């Protein structure tokens, strides 16, 4: 007769039901590890300001769309401008929150050789890069929305000739 301790049954991690881990077939796959490792916050060799710039560009760019299409001005002629202004306001709030996090989390001297993103100066650079990148991403998205017909005609001419 089989015992309840056979490996075919679900067992607690290391035999202790009060200790857990978050290892799943999805989170432990090579694809997931490579994908997460290539995100700018984890990519080796980037300075904090470049990390913030890349994260900010993505966030500024993709936040304009929901504000434009779902915001209170969605049915008006100035929906794109309303989306841009709302995005700028949200980016300002996010930048203030990032700055506050850096002020309370990285107080005092940082040890030599510490990860630059885990120091007060590094986090400040990350926050500055985030702000500049998010503003730039929002303006680019606004420009593309305002000139959609032009961009569409360029791509139609390029690919349908």
Curated annotation (Swiss-Prot):
Disulfide bonds: none
Membrane-crossing segments per the record: 84-104, 126-146
Keyword list, A-Z: Membrane, Photosynthesis, Photosystem I, Thylakoid, Transmembrane, Transmembrane helix
Membrane topology field: Multi-pass membrane protein
Domain of life (superkingdom): Bacteria
Keyword Coiled coil: no
Subcellular location, principal: membrane
GO BP terms in the entry: photosynthesis
A GO CC term attached to the entry: plasma membrane-derived thylakoid membrane
Subcellular location: Cellular thylakoid membrane
Family: Belongs to the PsaL family.
HAMAP family assigned: PSI_PsaL
Name of the molecule in the record: Photosystem I reaction center subunit XI
Record organism: Trichodesmium erythraeum (strain IMS101)
Gene name in the database record: psaL
